């Protein structure tokens, strides 16, 4: 499936905003807690996603890609749950729709990178 440059740009914008939000939230989390660990893994996954969308030449191990995939699928799944409860046309509905679209775009690139390692 081909992804347009517009979809990539939208995904990058959302990922950059999510990274900033996660990094800011992480500062308030106590190290060693489950929330802190989740934040660390999510930030790493979002950085990998950004790198893949920018077509930067950085080699990721299959394990790094697999771990990122788990986190990105989790973000998409939680967003799908939120979308199901959001009022159509609301800001929340729009936000979750954009997150889901961005994760779908990223997962296409991530799956291609994983296939390249296979």
Predicted feature locations:
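Short amphipathic alpha-helical heptad-repeat segments
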Residues: 7-23, 39-42, 64-80
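Charged, low-complexity interaction regions
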Residues: 24-37, 58-62, 81-94, 115-118
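Short, charged, amphipathic alpha-helical segments
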Residues: 34-44, 66, 70, 91-101
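Amphipathic alpha-helical coiled-coil segments
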Residues: 45-62, 81-85, 102-117
